[in-house]
A protein has these predicted regions:
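Basic, low-complexity segments
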Residues: 1-56, 553, 559-565
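Trp/Phe/Arg-rich N-terminal binding region typifying the photolyase-homology
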Residues: 52-64, 76-132, 148
Length: 573
């Protein structure tokens, strides 16, 4: 049964704040934990999680705000689950930030965290709604409104996030898939397979492949491929879990060609798609080769405010997707989400990876000016004016050209040509004849039975419009997104997430983005603070979990305080 936490309950005499000196209390309230508590923790919309619980009268849930808040801290500080539990139990700053003011207040157990993660994942699979994304949106929108952050001008960048999987070669991949598929069979059949195929099932894929010579790899690939086909048939007849059947089916389809009445055939490496399975333990992870480096996992796209008048800039949206998705599609998804949340956006500064038909169409739809720092595509050959030298008037709705003005100031209308997505503009023959650039740099061409004509494709006009919007200050504005990406990925060593799967990866991404915003708000609210949130979480040593002060305090209170019932996070109900 769902029950929201009560954050307004009266504190007991064992509240740790009452036991502090005024100076210590002042330092605590100037710490990141106080900012976290006031600007994030108390704004967690617990009601979003109500659909995860039964409506029948039953045992109530653990405090959702504490669980979600701890997950945000875990993502923002790069904690493991064990470290998170340790901080929840013994770190004063963490407990204060999560509303656990009383020494007797018990934090949720690790099993409680596991259960909520499972429910959030299942809910996302069923509805397509990731509740952590909703939490990020609600909290961020409130912060934008409270601190009067202007959102009209935004900048955007994407970054690779590695999944928590081992990097496998083709043979290791198919062997790992075979082993995972066999584990889904009934125990009797597992034993039969283990005896018949001990070569591939008794060791890890890496140990099996380690001593193989290069010339033997293809033969083993053929053998394992045939075993996978046999295994797939048995999995289907034994009613194995559908996700296992799907993984085995995908690996066979990715790596092999099935020809009727003939042995299975191995695909050439060039025929394998970037969307192919990278690991049977994370079938959603994809492959991306970028900047001469291969990545297995996902891509995160960050949008943040960048108006120079803002005193603090905030990340406004986070997308997490397969890393083979084009940046233009991520931009379109971001604009759709921001529009749905009624976040006003007039212009977006991006790098050259974002321009393209998809992103430009989305910008026209949302009436947003796309401002790339560079443009993908070739350059105009020397001695000829680029299309950006001409001034184009475009229809706001369709994006089609209506007028064009040449560099010498002659303005004419633009008509559709016979071929699709092509246009023609007819200039005055007398004016063009007196122009010193006619027959030279100008793209207007003479015609025998027609006036001088400018023929152009719609795509050339669109690229020209983008080039005209480029400026030197645009590059400086976009450059700051690199620091945002660094802060976002810093908790994840080597850019590798501690989780697998798209849903869990997005949960971590939202948590990290919330902490980036929280750090910025803390610096804004406490500009004179010397505290470094990226380093030690605790206050000075006197307030740390292992300090003499803390151990003596706990021992003193425990010596005479023996409650019959220990409330769970009493101060937060």
């Amino acid at each position: 049964m769902f029950r929201e936490s009560n954050t307004n309950s009266q504190s007991s005499i064992f509240n740790t704040l009452w036991l502090m000196s005024p100076k210590m209390k002042e330092r605590l309230q100037a710490s990141w934990a106080h900012t976290f508590r006031q600007e994030l923790f108390v704004h967690i919309p617990e009601s979003l999680f109500a659909p995860l619980f039964s409506e029948i009268e039953s045992r109530p849930n653990a405090p959702i705000n504490i669980i979600v808040g701890a997950e945000v801290l875990k993502a923002g500080f790069g904690w493991s689950d064990e470290e998170m539990v340790e901080h929840l139990g013994f770190d004063l700053l963490t407990r204060y930030g999560l509303g656990l003011d009383e020494i007797s207040a018990e934090a949720p157990t690790i099993r409680t965290f596991y259960n909520l993660r499972r429910r959030v994942r299942q809910y996302a699979e069923e509805t397509g709604i990731n509740l952590y994304n909703e939490v990020f949106a609600r909290i961020t929108d409130e912060q934008i409104a409270k601190f009067l952050v202007k959102t009209n001008w935004q900048r955007m960048d994407s970054t690779q996030l590695l999944s928590n999987i081992a990097r496998l070669n083709r043979l290791e991949l198919v062997i790992a898939t075979l082993q995972k598929g066999v584990q889904a069979l009934p125990e009797v059949r597992q034993q039969a397979w283990g005896q018949a195929q001990e070569t591939y099932l008794s060791k890890t894929p890496q140990n099996i492949c380690y001593r193989l010579k290069d010339e033997a790899v293809e033969e083993h690939l053929q053998t394992v491929g045939q075993l996978l086909v046999t295994l797939l048939t048995e999995l289907q007849t034994s009613q194995a879990p559908s996700d296992i059947i799907e993984i085995v089916t995908r690996v066979i389809s990715d790596q092999y060609q099935l020809v009727a009445n003939s042995p299975i055939q191995l695909k050439a490496p060039t025929e394998i798609s970037a969307t192919s399975v990278q690991s049977p333990h994370d079938p959603e992870a994809t492959y991306r080769y970028k900047h001469e480096q291969g990545y297995q996992g996902y891509v995160a796209n960050l949008s943040e405010t960048c108006d120079p008048e803002n005193e603090v800039q905030l990340i406004t949206s986070v997308q997490t997707a397969a890393n083979c998705i084009d940046d233009g599609q991520l931009l379109a998804d971001s604009l759709d989400e921001l529009a749905e949340r009624q976040v006003a956006v007039d212009q977006v500064t991006v790098d050259g990876g974002y321009n393209g038909a998809t992103s430009e169409k989305a910008c026209r739809q949302h009436r947003v000016k796309l401002r790339p720092t560079t443009i993908r595509g070739g350059q105009t050959k020397a001695g000829v004016w680029g299309w950006e030298a001409y001034e184009w008037t475009l229809d706001e709705e369709s994006g089609e050209p209506r007028q064009v003005t040449c560099p010498q100031g002659q303005t004419v209308s633009v008509q559709r040509a016979r071929k699709a997505a092509r246009y023609a503009a007819h200039f005055d023959e007398t004016i063009c004849g007196d122009c010193p650039f006619f027959h030279k740099e100008c793209r207007v061409q003479p015609r025998r039975h027609q006036p001088p004509t400018l023929n152009v494709t719609l795509r050339s006009i669109q690229v020209a419009d983008l080039r005209q919007g480029m400026s030197a200050d645009n590059a400086a504005i976009r450059a700051n997104t690199e620091s945002t990406v660094h802060a976002f990925k810093h908790p994840f060593a080597g850019g590798k997430l501690p989780v697998r799967g798209l849903i869990r990866s997005h949960m971590m991404a939202c948590g990290s983005a919330l902490m980036v915003n929280l750090r910025r708000l803390h610096d804004y609210l406490h500009p004179d603070s010397t505290e470094n949130m990226a380093q030690e979480v605790g206050l000075p040593h006197i307030l740390s979990a292992n300090s003499l002060f803390w151990r003596v305090l706990v021992g003193f209170i425990a010596s005479f305080y023996r409650p019959q019932i220990v409330p769970l996070a009493k101060s937060c109900y």
